[in-house]
Structures are given as structure tokens and as C-alpha cells.
């Protein structure tokens, strides 16, 4: 049966892709079909995906725009594919990711197997102790502004399967159904919220930034998590030069450096007393700045360390307020812990990894709300 199809795609690959999508959960897309509704005719739905992808006739539906609030008060727009489309995207991702990921830089940490945000924070912490200056920058609307021609050039360099190339191009062109039900065509970018989008973002940034800076500034190590980047420098002059060079490089790649989220930082501590106006930066929910610490002999000194950011604390407190714990007094502590312990545990496991005493503020706030 498979031999009569245009493309040789195994049914087992589609099944494995579905299991990954199921594990990731997620909301319904434009067709309003939830994962549970999709599973009511699981065999038929998976066969339909396999049949259409194998014949070359699979056409991705529009992605559903969902706006979520950002910690800085802005709005982040996600593009949520349908469950069927998430399975189809996962099929391609599972096929191409192993070979592509092997090419990525060791200091690319976002959305990669075996990599994590905490690894990026820890590596940045260690480098801040060794190097005095940091260039921190963010890319304005990175997912929404990736140039399709440049991206597909990178994709074709790594992906040779014709059907994978065909569907990647179709996903890039899939329109967006906005919150007011307007269908907007897509001419650039890859929707943040798509299954394959993080891999495409990493591939684009691999050539736009990682390879470039490794060649032009090999003595300036970096940590990148998607479009959030920190680069370490030996001097203020080097940092100033590099910030300008990065801005130019991004423009060449048709991206824009975020004007208010890009800066030069001095990693001040007891051994680095230089007067410089900017002595802190926030990376992946942690604010790096001078903090009191004890050395091996128990003596107090100032070190440059990460701790949970005020923005992250504010976001967590806001979430706790929505639980309305004070009006749920009839609930037993066991019931409350069953409901909220998984969330709290995740927060403390992440933000408590570095300078954990800062998380006492959240623990105290939670106690007041009970």
C-alpha cells in the first residue's frame, strides 16, 4: 500500500508523533477539536494524516491566534495549530531533528533535547565570575520576523527528504486566524506555538548568530535560549564593539535588536569595583547582579550571582491570587496541596536552584494568603 504513495512515510512514525503530541497536551486549534475529541476517532484521524502526507496532498490549516500576557505587561501572540496539524508537524520534526540538532552549538539551550534553561543560567553564572562584561540582547519579534527565503536556505542545507521540505514550506505559509476571526496570510516568521517552529528558529539562529559569532569573536562565549542571548566580554571597549556588530549582523539577517532589552552590563563584585551605571541583567527569569555571599571560610563578600527576578516573583504572586485561597478555608490542606503543590514544586525547583533565599519572599506571601 505504501509503495503506491508519492512519499514513503511509515504509519509507525505517525503513531509515535501522536504519542508525543498527546504527552505535550495543548489546546484545540481553528477546528475546535480537542485532543480528547480527536481520540474519539483516533484510528481514522491518524490514517487520514498518514494518507494525505504520504500522497503529498496534506495542506496545513490556519493557526489559531492566542494572546497571552507577558511578564513585562505586553502581549505575546501564539499560533496554535490543530491537533491533527500538530501530529503532522511532529512527524517531520521527529524525522529531521536528530541530524539537525547534532550540528547546533553547545551553547544553544532552548527547545533542545538534553538542554535546559537552568543549564544556560548556570553556564552564564560561571562565565560572569571569569569575565567582567556582558552584552545582553533580545530580538524584537523573532519568531514573527524570520525571513522565509533565508530560513529555507538553511533547511535545504540539512533536510534532503522532498516531502519534509514540501510540508515545512507549507507550514511557513499557513495563515493565521486572529482573535477577531480575521484570516491573515503569512509572508514571514514561523508561528510561536507550532511544534516545528522552535526547531526552525534554532536552525535560523544557528547561522544568523551562533556560527557567525563563533568565527568573528571566538573569545567571547555566549549562551542563547531561542532569541534571548547573553555574550561575555573581557573589556568595555570589546562589549561596545560587539553590541554594534551584533546589531549589524541581525539587520543583515533581516532581524531587529530589541531597543529596550539590549544593553552592556558590568559584572561588579568585591574584586571588580569599577563604577558603571548598569550592573544587572535578567536572563531566563533570573536577575544577575552583585549579591552578598559567604566564601569557604564563612566570610561575607560580594559576588555576581543570579536569583529569581522581581518580574518572576510578581508573576507567581499574581497566579497565587487567582487561586483565592483566603475564601477556600473549608478546603482541607490536603485538598489544597493536591491542587497546587505541583505548580509550587515546579516554581521552587526552577527558581530555587540559584540563591534560593530569594524564594522565601514567595513562601512568605503564600503563607499570608492561606
What is the predicted role of each segment?
Residues 1-370:
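Non-catalytic terminal/accessory segments
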